[in-house]
Amino acid sequence: MPATLRQVAEAAGVSIPTASRVLSGRAAEGRIPEATAERVRAAAAKLGYRPNVLARSLRTRRTRTLGLVVTELANPFYATIAGAVEAAASASGYTLIIAASGEDPARALEYLRELPSRPADGLIVAPAPGSEVEAALIELAGAGFPLVTVDRLLPGLDCDRVVTDSRGAAAGLVAALTAMGCRRLAMAGGPDGVWTARERSAGFREGLDRAGLPFSEHLFRSGEFSVEQGRAAAEVFLASPQPPDGIVAANNRILAGVLETLAARGESARNVAVAGFDGVPYAPFLGRPIAVAEQPEAEIGRAAAGMLIERVEGCKDAPREVVLPLAVRTFPPEPAGTEGGGS
């Protein structure tokens, strides 16, 4: 098996971006000392590292095909992004290939290697966690392959990106719950290895600080972006000697699990308010207080597609970052005993 960029970087005692710049002939751009560059080249030679020549060759070979790699298309968040990317690509005369990694680093790596060989002129990626995925993306970007990341940031990856203000939105959800009267807040967080999850957890803590509320370790639980995580976290929170009166969920899957557990508890959990991210179309009908940070999925997709097409068509600007705001909306429950009507 050929050596990877990460292995070269480790052998030379440098970061992956530094190794990428040296091996792609851009050491001068990064002001990398010649001694360091020589150490990287020596490590590459010793390990038998071969750069991604395919990615470099594709810079001059246009197919009018773009690639999109997301974690799961069953999630409405990514499905809406994919739809917006496809519409923008089609309007500009490009075909879109879509792949879903399922948060599996091995599958993500497979797509990152396969899509450029199809070939695609450029990629939009919501990165799955894992150092090998990070190294593969850094190698593609270092080879000059057009690349845009969405929703998640990777340290050291030098490319265009579109993200949302997850930290600010999480703090906003805390403010919304405290405005409803909540004073003991819990959070069912996402994976520690995912940037978006870390930002939302940090925003939750910031929101508590602003509200003058304490952070309790027993009212915070990180885990996968899954319904199961929401169920398990809510069970732990409700079993606490002082259960929360408000729960923040790090994404829509986790929120669904939290709501399942609350519904199963019946009247005893009826007044627990909830908050979450992404579109929740059923929010007004839940019968409990809820706050939602609505993400601009379509705008994310359009912005990413526009940036990628500009790169494919020759844009040489420095890497750009677009940070989109999230709107926080609240839905108080209907007064008890009211009934809807209509003809």
Q: Which residues does each PLM region occupy?
A:
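Alpha-helical recognition/docking segments in bacterial nutrient-uptake
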Residues: R61-A175, A179, F237-A239, P243
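Hinge/beta->alpha junction and helix N-cap segments in small-molecule ligand-binding domains
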Residues: V53, V70-T80, I98-R107, P129, ...
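N-terminal helix-turn-helix DNA-binding module of bacterial transcription factors
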Residues: M1-R62, T338-G342
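Flexible loop/turn connectors
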Residues: E235, A239-S343
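Residue-level detector of anion-binding/catalytic polar loops
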Residues: S15, R50, S90-T95, D121, ...
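Short helix-capping segments at alpha-helix termini
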Residues: A91-S92, A143, L208-F215, S240-P243, ...
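Short beta-strand segments enriched in small/hydrophobic residues
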Residues: I16-R21, R59-E72, R184-G190
